[in-house]
A protein has these predicted regions:
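C-terminal helix-rich "cap/oligomerization" subdomain common to oxidoreductases
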Residues: 34, 42, 70, 152, ...
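Beta-loop-alpha module in the N-terminal Rossmann-like domain of NAD(P)-dependent dehydrogenases
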Residues: 1-38
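A short acidic, glycine-rich active-site loop
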Residues: 23, 100-108, 211-216
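A short helix->loop->beta-strand "cap" motif at the edges of active sites that frequently abuts
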Residues: 16-18, 43-48, 155
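Short glycine/proline- and charge-enriched loop/turn segments
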Residues: 17, 93-101, 204-212
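Hydrophobic residues in well-ordered beta-strands that form the structural core
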Residues: 22-23, 49-51, 183
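Contiguous beta-strand/loop segments that form the cofactor/metal-binding neighborhood of enzyme cores
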Residues: 116-189, 221-238, 254
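Predominantly a Rossmann-like dinucleotide-binding segment in NAD(P)-dependent oxidoreductases
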Residues: 47, 55-138
Length: 263
């Protein structure tokens, strides 16, 4: 769904007494997401609103998060992630690269996913640096976004989102003091989804390696997130990814768009 209409559809559905599952980023801009939250709160309805950051529900991410919470790789230090695709002919004419409809380019598109994942592993970011650039596509929005995000405790996320990644790529690496977790692939055109665990020994040197393969023919993250949404309704529990997450995500994106740096 084009970003420009997400907040309007959400409010319309809530006023009609419906629970809402809204695609990320939930609104076209930071101002729109702030206004949406205010309006939702004023409705005072006991309705669920879940935001569709489906990458949280990939089995490799679920497994990695569980391992981090169990302190298997020790205290986290930093994250490094690359996410990109090669687009298609005349991609610059599509709505995703029309700022009026999308709100931005690759940062708000694929970039929002790896920002979201970085948040759930490292926490909130207090320092943001970014470089946004259109290298290839003739568009007024960026086709590449480079971000360095830092938490209050100086944990760092290095993120690169691109639609000039000629071979589709998803890589998400989590570095801890006892080891490293690496998620590679999402299935389909992004290659088989795998989770690598590099366990460091006390003497360092070559780590032990364990690999989990997730070879489902379909992307089950969509099914997982909808099942999670339905469960939150049936059990009347808090949604796992709500408007607060969309707000924090868009706050970072807004900061980047306000302070664009050219290469």
């Amino acid at each position: 769904t084009p970003h420009r209409y997400l907040d309007k559809f959400t409010l319309f559905s809530l006023k009609s007494g419906k629970h809402v599952f809204v695609e990320k980023p939930a609104a076209i801009s930071f101002l729109k997401i702030k206004n949406l939250i205010k309006k939702v709160n004023s409705l005072n309805k006991n309705l669920k609103i879940q935001v569709g950051f489906n990458h949280r529900f990939h089995p490799s991410i679920i497994k990695a998060l569980k391992m981090v919470k169990q302190n298997i790789i020790g205290d986290l230090m930093y994250i490094r992630s690359r996410y990109g695709h090669g687009a298609r002919k005349n991609y610059h004419k599509e709505w995703r690269m029309n700022k009026f409809i999308s709100g931005g380019g690759e940062l708000i598109d694929q970039g929002s996913h790896i920002i979201d994942l970085s948040r759930i592993f490292l926490g909130e970011f207090t320092k943001i640096d970014s470089t946004l650039k259109s290298f290839f596509w003739k568009s007024k929005v960026e086709d590449n976004a480079f971000l360095t995000l830092k938490t209050k405790s100086n944990k760092v996320a290095f993120l690169h989102a691109s639609c000039t990644e000629w071979k589709n790529k998803f890589s998400f690496e989590i570095f801890g003091k006892k080891g490293k977790l690496e998620i590679d692939g999402l299935g389909g055109s992004y290659g088989k989804e795998k989770l690598y665990f590099y366990k460091m020994s006390k003497n360092l040197g070559k780590p032990k390696l364990k690999i989990w393969n997730y070879s489902s023919k379909v992307d089950i993250s969509w099914k997982n997130e909808i099942s999670d949404f339905v469960r939150s309704i049936k059990l009347n529990k808090r949604v796992s990814c709500g408007l607060k997450d969309a707000y924090e995500n868009m706050k970072i994106i807004n900061h980047c768009y306000k302070k664009i740096k050219r290469l």
